[in-house]
Amino acid sequence: MALPSAFLNPFVPSPVTANPRTKFARVGKGFNVSCLIKTEQTKSAVTETGVSPATKEVNEPSLSTVLVNYSADWDPYNATSTPIYQTATFKMKSATEFGEYYYSRNANPTRHTLEALLAQIDNAKFAYCFSSGMTALTSVCELVSPGDEIVTVEDIYGGSYNFINNLIGRKEGIVVKHVNTSDLDEVKRNMSNKTKLVWLESPSNPQLRVSDIRSIAKIAHAYGAILFIDNSVMSPVLSNPLDLGADIVMHSATKFIAGNSSCIGGSIATNNEELGNKIHSFQKATGCALSPKDSWICLEGIKTMALRVQEKQRNAQLIAEFLASHPKVTEISYPGLQSDPGYELHNSQSKGPGSVISFKTGSLPLSKQIVEDTKYFSMTVSFGGVGSCICLPWYTSHSSIPDSQKLKVGLTRDLVRLSVGIEDVEDLVMDLQNVLSIQPQF
C-alpha cells in the first residue's frame, strides 16, 4: 500500500514516541547505525581512532540483522513480536473523522508492518500484501486494457499461464505472446506499440531459464511498456529486480517469505507512485489483502529468511553437482552450475542461484519412481519452505498448460523439480542416490 510516513522510515519513531533505546534508522534505501539521545537523533560510531562520531562512516547492517531487528515502532508496548490486530474495524476519532485505521479490508497495522518491511528489502517506495500470489498477479493484470498486448516468458508458472491466457486474454480481448525471453532478438520482434506489459520470471519456473532483466527493461521502456518480474524463485534475499530496471516485482509470500509452508500470501512492490496507487485501489476495492494473522505468520517467518535461503542454497548447490555427475540424469537446470547456459548472466544480476533445481532422466517411470520413493523430499507442489519438496511439474504445477505448449518449450513428462530444504545435505544426497540406484518398475 502507499505507506504512511511512520512506515516509510520504519526504524525511526515519530518525534512524539521516540525511544532512546532505538538502534536502527533507515536513511533513503540504505541503513545507518544510529542512536537516539533524549529524542534527538545523531549518527554515532564506536572507534579506536578518535575520529569524530559525526564524521565517521558506519557500515550498513546485513539483511539478516535488519530482518531480525525489524519491529513496529507504533506499538505502545514495544512487543518483540509484532501484535496481530485481528479486528474487522477500528473506532473512529469522531462521528465525522476516521483514524489512520478504520476497516481492515483497507488497512491494518499488522499488514502495514509487513508491507513496510517488504518495501524496504525490495528497495521500493510502495508495497502491498495480498491473500495469495495469484491475487497479487491479478492486481498487475488490472493495469492492462482490452486491445493491449502482454509479452511473457514462455517457460512460465502454470497458474500464471492459465490466468493470463484463459481468464484475461480470452475474456478481455488481450493478446498474450509467449516468448523465449532468453533471446533478446525474439523479445524485440514481439514488441509493438500495443505492448502494455512484459512479464518475466528469471529464473523461470520450472526450467530455470535466465533472462537479461536490464536489457529487457530497456526494450520494454522504449515501447512504453511496464516490466513486471515474478521473483518468487529467488526471494528478496537473492534478487532485487527493481534495481535492475523492473517497474513491479512480485513474490509468492507462501514460499521464502513465510518459509514454513504455513500460509498463503503474495506481495507486490514498486517505486512508481501511479502504478502503486492503482494496485492499492485494486487491493482495497476487491478485498484481497492479506489477513492480519497471515501477515503475522509472514512477519515471524521472514526473521529467518536470510539464513534459510543461505542454507537451502548451499544444499542445492551440492545436490545439483551430485545430480549433474549422475549417469541417470540426462539434463539438469540450475544457474549455480558453470555448465548452465544462464550461469554468467544470472551471477551478474543476482546474489546466488537459489534452491530450486530441475532435471530430466529421459524416462517417465524413473522420474515417477524418484518422486514417489524419496524419503526426505515431500511429494508436493510449491517451493521455498524449510522442508525439501519434489514433483513432476507436467502433472502438477503446470498441468493447466496444454501439452503441446509444454512440449514446445521443453517441459517434458520426465522433468523433476526439486525445492531443496534445510535438512542435512548428506541425508538428501543419500536419499536421491538410493532412489536413482533402484531399477524402475515398468
UniProtKB/Swiss-Prot annotation:
Its cofactor is pyridoxal 5'-phosphate. The keyword Amino-acid biosynthesis applies. The lineage of its organism: Eukaryota, Viridiplantae, Streptophyta, Embryophyta, Tracheophyta. Forms homodimers. May form homotetramers from two homodimers. It comes from Mimosa pudica. The modification N6-(pyridoxal phosphate)lysine is found at residue 255. Its main location: plastid. Optimum pH is 8.5-9.0. This is Mimosinase, chloroplastic. Keywords: Amino-acid biosynthesis, Chloroplast, Lyase, Methionine biosynthesis, Plastid, Pyridoxal phosphate, Transit peptide. Belongs to the trans-sulfuration enzymes family. It is an enzyme of class 4 (lyase). InterPro entries: Cys/Met-Metab_PyrdxlP-dep_enz, PyrdxlP-dep_Trfase, PyrdxlP-dep_Trfase_major, PyrdxlP-dep_Trfase_small.
